[in-house]
Amino acid sequence: MKTPPEPRVAAPRVFASPDISIVGGASSLESDLAMLGSLLDQTLARQVSGAFLDTVERVRQAADEDLDTSIEELEKLDLATTSQLVRAFSMYFHLANVAEQTHRGRQGRGDRDEDRGPLNRVTELIEDALAAGELKRADVEEAVRQLDVRPVFTAHPTEAARRSVLIKLRAVSDLLDERVSARRVANEDRRWRRAAEMVEELWLTDELRLEKPEVLDEARNALYFVDGLMRRPVTDVLLHLVDCLAAIGIELPVRARPLTFGSWIGGDRDGNPFVTPQVTTSVVDMSLDHSIRTMFLLFARLIDEISVSERHSEISKELDASLQKDLEVITNLDPRYRRLNYEEPYRLKLTCVRAKLESTLLRMQRRSRHQPGVDYHSSDELLDDLMLMYDSLMANGAEIIAHGTLEQSIRTVAAFGLTLTTLDVREHAEAHHAALGPLLDRVGQFDRPYLSLSREGRVELLSEEVASPRPLGLFPTALDGRDLTTFQTFESIRGLLNHFGPNACESYIISMTKGADDVLAAVVLAREAGLVELRSGVARIGFVPLFETIEELRRAGEITDQLLSVPSYRRLVALRGDVQEVMLGYSDSNKDAGIAASQWAIHRAER
């Protein structure tokens, strides 16, 4: 039976605005910490009791002054009070982290605005090196063209924060940012009342769910962050990169993709039986839905802004032909747009783009076939439409308009594509051998089981299989259980690529790679699923060995050399742009040898 709580010391609506005069300027970290601490104190007094707030303060002071005193103070508390105390300090640290992150972001933006950011410093170094003859401009331009940074989202088991909590912490961060530019005291009071509301909601919200989140829950949490990036921050970073490069006379092509995003959520099958092929498809469906709905907002703004009339500016022949074709094949276009925007070709084209996105979303929901010209199969098709407008504006004297919101939207679409992130799929090396065993044994070409072959024997056999156009047989009759699921994962990848285009999934990661045969086994399964056909020049995904243990990290170069010396595999790499991706180290590296040894092994492998 629960003990009744002590009477609360204040009515729920009682709120006292923190006094910023005692903690410095509005933008200081100390000010933010003090104000958030004050709001938390008020919440504890209202929602628990004044006596509890006194206890929190005594424990805090004891921890600052003397460890023994702190222990004595804690030993006096009952379990319920101790639990509340842990929550109180945890929440303070959450709020402190938010304040620090917001402060760092504020500093970064300030540095960028004053040309003191990291990109500014790098471009200054490049400019000095060019002037000194240490770098050639052609080499820098080529490096810019090849620039490819891809942060990857993953759902680590230790990341258990609920989206409800994340949203409230984000709101607190936004309020801290807004406070910097606040001018009126009334607005300041209103802002801190809103912050008090968020803090109180955080206190009354379960920090963790009682049930373990499912894969789709993890995906929703990740999409919360990606949505926020797509709405503005990534565009700002890309435009800053454009400005920095322009300062040294180098142009970043408008549809270049120097920054994209990847995700393991929904694709990381290693050790997680809940990541089924069906779940993988559902996660990508969800990502596409989020991406297109955010694009609706981007293009609504473009439609409002780009009201260029043919009465005042011509359009390119290419844009005119594309627009006429759109008007012929798009049946879900409201007739009034044809009438109202008849002499505003950019608005009309953007309205057609929006109609195609609506059809793309509908196609995904219905699992229907792609209709060229009616919906988009890939982000490249969407970018083609946007570039037609950009090129037309540039060719007809409207460069300022082209370089405005339209260019920003093109760079945003290039970064995120139709599915926001590119999915990486990962599976343990042994799973591929286990699935191949019964299939190869059934062929009957060998005098002993496939799984009993040495690594050298497997490499020889699998090298021939990768090059062979002969299928191993009908899988449903040969596989069951986990082996069937392993193969179906490759089938689901084929479905994703067919449905969402080549950017939906690009890399298949083989964890615990210990030899070239581990990668070749995955390639053979991919060939059976129609993802690889060397004689036809088909290599729809790349294969990434993941070296994790200390021994494999030491042998990473040797194993990679052996893999690339296999003619059939070398042909596959050539079809993928002559780039072999390798992944070094993961959490299992630390488990295998400890943090210091594993980091040193990774460092040596990278060199």
Locations of the language-model features?
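Often metal-dependent polyanion-binding catalytic scaffolds in large enzymes
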Residues: 1-463, 480-482
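Short glycine-rich or small-residue beta-strand-to-loop segments that form or flank ligand, phosphate
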Residues: 90, 390-392, 507-511, 543-546
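A general structural signal for short secondary-structure junctions and capping/turn motifs
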Residues: 255-257, 265-266, 411, 498-500, ...
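Active-site cores of enzymes that catalyze phosphoryl transfer or operate on phosphate-rich substrates
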Residues: 329, 352, 359, 422-423, ...
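Generic non-transmembrane alpha-helix signal with a bias for helix starts/N-cap capping motifs
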Residues: 406, 605-606
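Interdomain boundary/hinge elements
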Residues: 536-543
